[in-house]
């Protein structure tokens, strides 16, 4: 007697060319000038180049840290010459110690 009514079937139509937009900023309508000034927003990321940049930046930071550590070690040393004329490196001492 009372059977459940069947839900209406919806037909999924494929998106038309004008309606389809790619995700992200690549699908946004922008001017050519904006795309020329900001190409990194519209170009697919290049993972090998990103990895190379990350390694290079890490090595630069490590080298700067190394130079800083070397400079800190040299700051407390000075060249001393004994009575016989031999020179050697000696650590600075404070008069207050």
Swiss-Prot record:
- Residues spanning the membrane: 48-70
- Spell out the subcellular localization from the entry: Membrane
Record-given protein name: Small integral membrane protein 8
Family, according to the entry, reads as follows:
Belongs to the SMIM8 family.
Q: Does the keyword Transmembrane apply?
A: yes
Q: Does the entry feature the keyword Membrane, yes or no?
A: yes
The record's listing under Pfam families reads: DUF4500
Query: Looking at the record, which segments are called Disordered?
Result: 1-24
**UniProt KW keywords:** Membrane, Transmembrane, Transmembrane helix
Q: Name one GO cellular component term.
A: membrane
For membrane topology, the record states: Single-pass membrane protein
Matching entries from InterPro entries are given as:
UPF0708
* Main subcellular location: membrane
Signal sequence bounds: none
Amino acid composition bias (Basic and acidic residues), ranges on this chain: 9-20
